[in-house]
Design a protein with these regions (language model features):
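Solvent-exposed, well-ordered amphipathic alpha-helical segments
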Residues: 2-4, 24, 62, 98
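Short aromatic-glycine-(Arg/Gly/Cys) micro-motifs in beta-strand/loop hairpins
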Residues: 2-15
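A broad, low-specificity signal marking well-ordered, structured residues that form hydrophobic/aromatic
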Residues: 8, 20, 58
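A short, exposed loop/beta-hairpin motif centered on an aromatic-Gly-Thr core
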Residues: 14-23
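Short, conserved charged micro-motifs
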Residues: 26-30
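Short, solvent-exposed secondary-structure boundary/capping segments
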Residues: 32-34
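Short, mixed-charge low-complexity intrinsically disordered segments
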Residues: 36-98
Length: 98
């Protein structure tokens, strides 16, 4: 049996935040347990508030049609993150002090 990738949504404390592709739920759900993801989400902010803190609840579900569209638009525009994630929200700009 051949599976086609499905688009999934990661919710943080009930808010749809990221969309990404995975073949099956088990594969999609693994992202919730990745330390690098929690670190990245803790560094990204909205209105100067981190997206994710230590006690944030992360949940995976199938993406809704509007979220699928946003993911596909980001993929077509080559605006996915290095990890092939599409943010579904507007983030604060990343400031670099180099």
């Amino acid at each position: 049996m051949i599976f086609a990738p499905t688009i999934w949504t990661l919710e943080i404390d009930g808010k749809p935040t990221l969309a990404f592709e995975a073949l099956k739920y088990r594969e999609a759900d693994e992202i919730r347990h990745q330390e690098w993801l929690r670190l990245e989400l803790g560094q990204r902010k909205i209105n100067h508030v981190p997206l994710c803190v230590a006690d944030s609840r992360l949940r995976i579900r199938l993406a809704r049609p509007a979220e699928m569209l946003l993911y596909r638009q980001a993929a077509e525009a080559n605006k996915l993150s290095d990890n092939h994630l599409a943010y579904l929200i507007e983030l604060d700009p990343v400031v670099s002090f180099r």
